[in-house]
Curated annotation (Swiss-Prot):
Organism (species): Oryza sativa subsp. japonica
Role summary: Variant histone H2A which replaces conventional H2A in a subset of nucleosomes. Nucleosomes wrap and compact DNA into chromatin, limiting DNA accessibility to the cellular machineries which require DNA as a template. Histones thereby play a central role in transcription regulation, DNA repair, DNA replication and chromosomal stability. DNA accessibility is regulated via a complex set of post-translational modifications of histones, also called histone code, and nucleosome remodeling.
Domain notes: The [ST]-Q motif constitutes a recognition sequence for kinases from the PI3/PI4-kinase family.
Gene Ontology terms describing biological process: heterochromatin formation
Protein name (Swiss-Prot/TrEMBL): Probable histone H2AXa
Spans annotated as Disordered: 1-21
CDD domains reported in the protein's UniProt record: HFD_H2A
Assembly: The nucleosome is a histone octamer containing two molecules each of H2A, H2B, H3 and H4 assembled in one H3-H4 heterotetramer and two H2A-H2B heterodimers. The octamer wraps approximately 147 bp of DNA. Interacts with numerous proteins required for DNA damage signaling and repair when phosphorylated on Ser-134.
GO molecular-function term, one example from the UniProt record: protein heterodimerization activity
Phosphoserine: residues bearing it: 134
UniProt-listed PROSITE patterns: HISTONE_H2A
Length: 137
């Protein structure tokens, strides 16, 4: 009955490898660092154990969403590298992200191409003979 496992606390204690809170939650964003920022920022006197995990998950989701849309915009423009212009196009073409980041200016993002309907030429207005002048005199 004398096994090396049991024995009432005799022998060396087994050391376990440290597991980060990010890996426990299945996240890539750093839970510990966000917890440290929340505590240092004095947003509240105390910070719950689940708050940095939840915030990390939200930030990771938002980053993944923006990166996916920006990657699609880069691919549409036949580019391999995401630049600020692609992020701008991704954010402004997505209704929810555009509302969330409505007041945010993205450096070197440019503007969305937009021509008002009034300024566009009229579509097929009547006679339309082939080879006729574009304006009637």
């Amino acid at each position: 009955m004398s096994s090396s496992q049991g024995g009432g606390g005799r022998g060396k204690a087994k050391t376990t490898k440290a597991v980060s809170r990010s890996s426990k939650a299945g996240l890539q964003f750093p839970v510990g660092r966000i917890a440290r920022y929340l505590k240092a920022g004095k947003y509240a006197e105390r910070v719950g154990a689940g708050a940095p995990v939840y915030l990390s998950a939200v930030l990771e989701y938002l980053a993944a969403e923006v990166l996916e849309l920006a990657g699609n915009a880069a691919r549409d423009n036949k580019k391999n590298r995401i630049v600020p212009r692609h992020i701008q196009l991704a954010v402004r073409n997505d209704e929810e992200l555009s509302r969330l980041l409505g007041t945010v200016t993205i450096a070197a993002g440019g503007v969305l191409p937009n021509i008002q309907q009034v300024l566009l030429p009229k579509k097929g207005g009547g006679k339309g003979d082939i080879g006729s002048a574009s304006q009637e005199f």
